[in-house]
Amino acid sequence: MRYFTADLHLQHPLLADLRGFPTPVAHDAAVMAELYLLDPDRDELWILGDICTGGTESMRSALAQLATLRVPMHLVAGNHDPIHSCNRKPERHLAEYLAVFRSVQQHAVADLGGATVQLSHFPYLGTEDRFSRDRFTEFQLPDHGDWLLHGHTHAAERRSGERSVCVSLEAWDLRPASEIEVLREMR
């Protein structure tokens, strides 16, 4: 079964607090506990960006935690991931990411229930972020009629548009969304 999530932000003091945890360690333990429930023989995890808070130290801490998972993982990078092209010299981190993830990309395409689904960290172009501002517009995909799974917004609502599903942890009770759950949202 494929699972989708975004915006883990491991070791992030502010996000830990906003999500109701006393410390980043407690936050990370709760997030990782949900990921440990995935079966490495049957499941696959797609993380749609922002595993960390940004910066090399944060990146290495997040990668070390994620490396303890045995489930196959793919990353669609987000703006807080040093591997994303919005950051300086992202290529210098590629080997470290590929030691943990089977693939690392800025955007991907999947087939879910016969539908073509775009996978991106960012919502469709024209969708404002949670602060009602246009940011990272050069990385937002235009809506050409496909469904989109994304993160970035940290929205509690799962549906973010006519053909968009947000897989940020906030929308899924701090756990990854299964392909079956995503397909339900797409109905």
Where are the language model's segments positioned?
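Conserved beta-sheet core of the metallophosphoesterase superfamily
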Residues: 92-187
